[in-house]
Amino acid sequence: MAGKGFGFSLGKMKELADAFKKAQQVQEGAKQVQEDLNNMEIEGQAQGGLVKVWVSGNQEPLRAEIAPEALNEGAEVLSELVAAAMKDAYQKSTAAMKEKMEALTAGLGIPGL
């Protein structure tokens, strides 16, 4: 039993060190991705731009713009236009988020990411 230590060979220690290094890279990268997403402004629109909404990359609503012509459409239609613009912005922000996360995890060799 002498000389066996804790059962970690130098190769295993290197693997462990590499795993910690990758985890640190992911953590640092995730902070940067979060900051990038917070700073993004993603536009969603409906009916050719009659209604526009902007959200951050984290899907936080930022502002909305409604063309005067849209106000003449009535409350029900206007509600549908706002919902459609929000859905458009949501889908775009989700795609941006996915793209950023894929870029973060690419090349790290982490299974399942």
Swiss-Prot record:
One annotated GO molecular function: DNA binding
Record has Transferase as a keyword: no
Gene Ontology cellular component terms for the protein in this record: bacterial nucleoid; cytosol
Keywords from the UniProt entry: Cytoplasm, DNA-binding
Major location category of this protein: cytoplasm
InterPro entries: YbaB-like_sf (IPR036894), YbaB/EbfC (IPR004401)
Compartment annotation: Cytoplasm, Nucleoid
Any single Pfam family the record assigns to this protein: YbaB_DNA_bd
Binding partners and assembly: Homodimer.
Role of this protein: Binds to DNA and alters its conformation. May be involved in regulation of gene expression, nucleoid organization and DNA protection.
Entry's family note: Belongs to the YbaB/EbfC family.
The protein, known as: Nucleoid-associated protein Synpcc7942_0464
Organism from which the protein derives: Synechococcus elongatus (strain ATCC 33912 / PCC 7942 / FACHB-805) (Anacystis nidulans R2)
Taxon lineage: Bacteria, Bacillati, Cyanobacteriota, Cyanophyceae, Synechococcales
